[in-house]
Amino acid sequence: MPSFDVVSEVDKHELTNAVDQANRELDTRFDFKGVQAKFELEDGKVINQSAPSDFQIKQMTDILRARLLARGIDIRCLEFGEVETNLAGARQKVTVKQGIEQKQAKQLVAKLKEAKLKVEAQINGDKLRVTGKKRDDLQDAIALLKKADFELPLQFDNFRD
């Protein structure tokens, strides 16, 4: 039976490249000259932003978003934490969300059932497997999920006939 997987993943190499480009842009920007501001990537899951003030953190957030979009990473996978300020400066943690959570997977399954397509969906950990009798039904399911607006980026893997 034909099937495909619905996943929400971020390419770690592209994420590393985007953070490096954002750091390089900080070095060349006039408003960040002589300022201790930087992005740090931890384990491919958390990006730490640090700067002397919260205003500069907001500017850095715009730089990070632009670099991620330029590298083809959907910014809906980012979860911005609170800006922590003290006398030494300001910091913010940005979490990169990977995988589809149980609640969101149930919403995807409900969306497929609501459309009354001839497909079945199963939740497998942090992915969703969709199976159907015909390839056309699966392509309709992909089109439906692409058109639906979810708060996380979706990719479609393992399309098998």
From Swiss-Prot:
A single Gene Ontology CC term: cytosol
HAMAP family in the cross-refs: YajQ
Keyword vocabulary terms for this entry: Nucleotide-binding
InterPro entries in the cross-refs: DUF520, UPF0234-like_C, UPF0234_N, YajQ-like_sf
Reported function: Nucleotide-binding protein.
A Pfam family per the record: DUF520
GO-annotated molecular function: nucleotide binding
Family stated for the protein in its record: Belongs to the YajQ family.
Residue stretches in coiled coil: none
Gene3D superfamilies linked: 3.30.70.860, YajQ-like, domain 2 (3.30.70.990)
PANTHER family cross-referenced by the UniProt entry: UPF0234 PROTEIN YAJQ
Protein name, UniProt field: Nucleotide-binding protein XCV3791
